[in-house]
């Protein structure tokens, strides 16, 4: 579905929405279920269309994560993560304990969030990374869909900073701190 974004109200106050209001609009058919957007501090933010390279990396990474994750973990693919009553994000992947239902996942439950970025690199490494940290997501990977280099964010801080951000080359092995069973070399994905 194509979404028309506007900046007509730039500089003017805008109405803020809650997660509950957005869910009600989706349930009522006002917003289509397949519409790609996130809610950030009450503001609806349309997401960029995904290009070929993004989809290639995402498909290969999906196979690896599903194959390697332990049975006590759930792998969400473009699942909404409700961080507070005015914010939800939709990472490409999210790993969290299986005992938690998808709609109940909160920031501190997320062991690993992964964003595959092509045109959204600045947004994913900037604003979204700060939001994930502020809400206690334990680890964030932002993968460059072109080069497959990955920025690994660990030790989230309540002020939205990360204690560590390391750029890892595509040839190096990535292993999330909270999951012993998962390791990936982005260069091996095809």
Predicted regions and their residues:
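Gly/Pro/Ser/Thr-rich low-complexity, intrinsically disordered segments predominantly at protein N-termini
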Residues: 1-190
């Amino acid at each position: 579905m194509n979404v028309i974004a506007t900046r007509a109200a730039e500089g003017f106050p805008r109405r803020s929405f809650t997660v509950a209001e957005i869910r009600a609009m989706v349930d009522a058919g006002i917003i289509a279920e397949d519409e790609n957007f996130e809610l950030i501090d009450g503001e609806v933010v349309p997401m960029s269309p995904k290009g070929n390279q993004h989809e290639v990396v995402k498909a290969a990474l999906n196979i690896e994560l599903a194959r390697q994750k332990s049975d006590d973990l759930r792998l969400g693919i473009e699942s909404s993560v409700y961080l507070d009553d005015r914010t939800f994000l939709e990472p490409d992947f999210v790993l969290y304990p299986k005992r938690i239902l998808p709609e109940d996942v909160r920031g501190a439950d997320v062991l690993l969030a992964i964003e595959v970025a092509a045109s959204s690199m600045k947004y994913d490494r900037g604003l979204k990374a700060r939001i994930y940290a502020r809400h206690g997501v334990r680890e964030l990977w932002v993968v460059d869909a072109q080069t497959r280099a990955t920025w690994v964010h660990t030790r989230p801080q309540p002020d939205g900073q990360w204690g560590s951000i390391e750029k890892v080359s595509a040839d190096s092995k990535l292993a999330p701190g909270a999951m012993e069973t998962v390791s990936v070399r982005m260069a091996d994905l095809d």
